[in-house]
Amino acid sequence: MRTVTVELVDAFVDGEVGGNVAGIVVEDAIDLSAVQRQEIARRVAVSETAFVLASGTADYKLEFYTPTRPIPHCGHATVGAFVRLAESGRLPQVEVVNETVDGPRRIHIEGTRAFLEQVPAELTRLDKSTTREVLDSLGITMDQLLPDAAPFLANNGNRSIQIGISDLNVLRTLRPDMDRIEAISNRLQCVCYYAFSLKSVVGGRDATARMFGPAYGIQEESATGMAAGPLACWLDSKASGQRREFKLEQGYLMSPASPSLILAKPERSGGQLAAMWVGGSASVRGVRQIPIDW
């Protein structure tokens, strides 16, 4: 029997509180099989666990597992992992490259924050029939949506269904039918729903969001960097490319609340959106020792 060390790191913390906890495995990750990684993620039982591996083409390679299945990308686990790597002196410089299933992605360290490069999201409006299904699965109607944000499918490596809601209280009191959300998400090959309002809990922020991902074993989580990136791309299109940063809240409307702050910074080339940098702060919550007996 051997024991695997898993750091529990809160990523996208808002000030010194909240965030979304991720499991991070560094030293013990390299010789674990995919079956072992999945079992460790199941036992850790947080939304995602990241395994930090060596890469032949980049500085590092991260693999991510929810409690029930692998997932291509994970924003908060990436932020948590690279903040910890920086704090432990393992990063050779402030910008490194992470190998992903979709190719190399840059990681930038700014003090105690880490930012991950995301490709500009492809945004596609849902058809009327699917839109009705999505709204029914949340217990809302068309007249409760933002006028210019009917549900749309977003793809930046992870696929999400983004739903703009006009009123913060409607977002707060959603009635998600997890079985229906799971079925719709699986049919559209999506990780999650990402419902948002442009009215924030804390003043001066651009949006508040909630994430539902039962297709990946996640009922609701408090910070979702890979879904926040497409929301920032949509906000950027509405701002005509004039903004340097977007501040997105998540976790405030959960019970219990776990306030999270996600920062998104557009990168432009030739006047066009070339990348969206999504990041924030992270702090260690604790350490778990997971025994494996095979």
Predicted regions mapped to residue ranges:
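Active-site proximal loop and beta-alpha junction motif in alpha/beta enzyme cores
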Residues: 1-73, 79-294
